[in-house]
Amino acid sequence: MDTEAVSFEDYRDCLKDLATVNALTLTHGPVLTWLDRATRNLAPNERATVLDVGYGYGDLLRRVHDWSRRKGRLVDLVGIDLNPMSEPIAKAATPSDVSIDFRTGNVFDYTPERPVDFVISSQTTHHMSNEELATFIRWMEQVAARGWYIADLHRHPVPFHVFGALARVARWHRFVQHDGPVSIARSFRKADWKKILHAAGVAPEAAEIRWHVPFRLCVSRLK
């Protein structure tokens, strides 16, 4: 899907199935757990701005909205995505009473109009080169006042083979069936992230690399 010309309908159906995959594989759990920790010292009436890079269907930001309601946290939610089709699709999938500011644009050209407390990004960084990733981390270091979190895949034979079989049985969108194993093959091991963090100028002790079930490798930093 990264290189193929895609219709609006195909892209929407693909994102919808990816959101189903995210729900079934507990993709957003580590992000929400980190936000629990990251906001622990905020006053009850203190607002925090959360920016999601590469929001796709918008399902992570909707989960963050639900989390904020459960926890009684005051949050402003913003998303930026490179694909112009993501914005109308994410907006259409979001209830009218859920306030999320979905934007279209290149993150490297994006300068937030208001201070951002936390930057999050899920299942997006495997689409970047190592050089782009180092630039992205440096960008987050500048933009995120309190911290940032990257959730992505762990490159391993087990999810590579299991996902392909599961996607075929579930009859998910053809892009999901094809791109899932490709994404796993393009994803990361701990040594990869250490090199990327070093290239970005982030000290080893300043960031945390943590593995989560099922085969998620997440990188975070609290300031």
Predicted regions and their residues:
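Hydrophobic adenine-recognition pocket in adenosine-nucleotide-binding enzymes
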Residues: 124
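A conserved beta-strand element that flanks and buttresses the S-adenosyl-L-methionine
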Residues: 120
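Class I SAM-dependent methyltransferase Rossmann-like catalytic core
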Residues: 4, 8-39
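Core SAM-dependent methyltransferase catalytic element
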Residues: 208-223
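A short, conserved alpha-helix within the catalytic core of class I
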Residues: 128-139
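Conserved beta-strand signature within the Rossmann-like core of class I S-adenosyl-L-methionine
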Residues: 145-153
